Every structure is written in C-alpha cells, then in structure tokens.
Amino acid sequence: MFVQEEKIFAGKGLRLHICSLDGAEWLEEVTEEITVEKLKEKCLKHCSHGSLEDPKSLTHHKLVHASSERVLSDTKTLAEENLQDNDVLLLVKKRAPPPTPKMAEVSADEKRKQDQKAPDKDAILKATAGLPARSTDRTVAQHNMRDFQTELRKILVSLIEVAQKLLALNPDAIELFKKANAMLDEDDEDRVDEVALRQLTEMGFPESRAVKALRLNHMSVTQAMEWLIEHADDPAADAPLPCENSSEAAGGLATGEAETKPTLGAGAEDPKDELTEIFKKIRRKREFRPDPRAVIALMEMGFDEKEVIDALRVNNNQQDAACEWLLGDRKPSPEDLDKGIDTTSPLFQAILDNPVVQLGLTNPKTLLAFEDMLENPLNSTQWMNDPETGPVMLQISRIFQTLNRT
C-alpha cells in the first residue's frame, strides 16, 4: 500500500474532502502542520494527474472552507486555519484581475470623453465673444416657462367673479352658501391625512401633536416627524394653531348670526349684502397660509416678515423661489396676483363657452375650490381629483393647452 510522505512525520492526521468546480471529489490525507499552499499544490497535482502544466497555476487558485465560506490563507498551516477532520474544501480558480489599460488607451479614452462633453457657460462665452450681440427678448422666454401657472391664477380670479354673479341669481343662494360655509368649517377641522396621522401615531407621537405637525408641514410625514422630534421637549408644541382658534371664533360668529338672523325678519337685510358678507367670510377662511418653516428660514436671512409672506404667496410657498424673488426684481408683485385675465380674450371666452365649465360655475363647491386653489395652490391636486370640481379643472387645462399651441 502506498503511504504518503506527510504521514511519516509527526502531527495530527486530517482527512479532508476536496471538491473542484468541474464536479470532481476526492479525499486528501494530510497532517495539520503543512501549509495551505502545500495542500493546494497536492490538489492541483491530483487534478492534473501528477504534474502542474502551468507554473503560475498555484497562484491562480484558492481553497475555500465550505461551511464557513472563508478563503484559506496560503501562508498559514492547516492547524492555524483551524481545519478539522472530514472538513470540506473547495478548489476554486481566482478571477483574473482586469488588465491595466495602457497609457495610450487612457489618453484616447479621456480625449473621447472631452470631445463628448457639453460646453460649460465659460466655454460658450469664450467661443461667442467675437460674435455681434443680437436683441433677444429673454423676458418673454422666461415668462413662457411659468405661463400656465400665471395664467391659471388670472383665470381663477375672473372665474370667481363670474361664479359669484351666477350664484347670486339663485333664489336659494344664501342657504347654499351658508351650507358651503359650514362645510368649509368641517373641512378645516377634518383635513388631516388619516394614513399620515396613523404612521406618526404608530411611531409613538401623541395624536394632537401629530395633527399639528401635519398641518404645519402640508401633510408631509417626513417633515412632520422632523418637527415633532425638534419640539419633543417644547411645551408650546401642545398649543393649538392660530388658524384653529380663528376657525372656532368664526364658526361661533356664524352660528350666532344664524340664530339672530331669523328674529330680524325677512326684509331686515338686503340678500345681496348678506351674500357679500358670506363671500367675504369664505375668502377670509381661505386666506393664504405661509409655511412657518419657510418664514423662519427667510427671516433669518434678514428679510422683513411682510416681505417674506408676500414672497411665499407669490411663489406658492416654495422657499427657494421666494428667496430668488426677494433677491430679484420682485415681479410679479403681490398686487398682480389679484388681477384677473382679460375677459374679452379668446382664451377666457373659450373657457366660458365650454358646457362643463358653465355647469360647474353654478355649483357653490366650484367657487370654494377656486378660492382655495387661488390662495393655496398646493391643494390643487385635491380639487383635481374631486368628482365635482375635477372635470371643470380638466376642461380649463385642455382649453389653455390647445390655444397655447396655436
């Protein structure tokens, strides 16, 4: 019987199961004193029938301990690698490292990237320095980018006036708007995203604080969570929002008026004046609410509070855009926001001629939606998805896009 040389020397004998990637399996009997490199050499000789074809083949392979999935170090002994009898080892060929690119190839690749790179502003100015200046109306080009939002606001202002006149002709207009006013109170109290509120309460935040945080942060769960963490130890965080107090006061006033009005008699007040007062109340409840975080951030830059609120109102509560407005020419001005579209323009006439819009203007809910979108553009999505107001907004958008392309 053939006896391997390693068994002649002292040392604990190990029986190791070797597996190669081609599916071959065999048993190697070695002592724990030999190195992993020697074992690897024996394994390669077994695979190549007793001779190594490539001298570098030893460095191109590695032994992996199957159960622990670790690569064995060539310089350590089997004892140092803590191999046990009947362990399974995998003989694996190492991945060849990617070839190092030649300098000529690197230079050519860099040159190709430079050729494909778009020129920056400095390069454009340098290349066009010798060209004659041409009169380009850059103001119009910039205006077209925000044309839809600007025109939509003007359209809403004019449509609100038309809707008020149409609804005032309805004999039940006062009752309709009293109900709308009550709906508005309920809407203000209940407008909390239930899913977002549940997420915050499941995190352990008190419900009252979570509601306040969501209202302050436009129903953004992430921003509301940040606010709750920042104000965790702030006792003022439990105080109600100013808008909640004003809503309660307005609601009480409306209730009081409703109770006293019947006693004054039917002819005590002109219905038109009463409608005007209701319209004013609705508009007060839909007043623009600046983002408190944006107000604080912009005031810390040194801007006056009134200027900051005007900037946020003009730029739909977008802090970055408001900052640019404050630093720029401040156009459009807050006064421009209350100007309607030219009522003789083809665009406005096309909108008024649309049957869906005509029908929608007789619905008090449409007027409420227009008022809300006018002062809080972030709520536009809510009204676009509403079954009553959504079709009206869709028709306005389609008419605008159609006429804008012609």
UniProtKB/Swiss-Prot annotation:
Instruction: Supply one GO molecular-function term.
Output: polyubiquitin modification-dependent protein binding
Q: Which residue stretches does the UniProt record annotate as biased composition, category Basic and acidic residues?
A: 108-122
Tell me the pathway: Protein modification; protein ubiquitination
- Keyword Cytoplasm found: yes
Q: Name one GO cellular component term.
A: cytoplasm
Q: From which residue to which does the signal peptide run?
A: none
Swiss-Prot/TrEMBL keywords: Cytoplasm, Repeat, Ubl conjugation pathway
Q: Which Gene3D superfamilies match?
A: 1.10.260.100, DNA helicase RuvA subunit, C-terminal domain, Phosphatidylinositol 3-kinase Catalytic Subunit, Chain A, domain 1
State the Gene Ontology BP annotations.
protein maturation; protein ubiquitination
Q: Where is the composition biased (Low complexity)?
A: 238-257
Q: Where does the UBA domain start and stop, copy by copy?
A: 186-231, 289-329
* Domain description: The UBA domains recognize and bind polyubiquitinated proteins.
The protein's matches in PANTHER family, at most eight in alphabetical order, are given as:
UBIQUITIN-ASSOCIATED DOMAIN-CONTAINING PROTEIN 1
What job does the chain carry out?
Answer: Non-catalytic component of the KPC complex, a E3 ubiquitin-protein ligase complex that mediates polyubiquitination of target proteins, such as CDKN1B and NFKB1. Within the KPC complex, UBAC1 acts as an adapter that promotes the transfer of target proteins that have been polyubiquitinated by RNF123/KPC1 to the 26S proteasome.
Protein name (record): Ubiquitin-associated domain-containing protein 1
Naturally occurring in which organism (per UniProt): Xenopus tropicalis
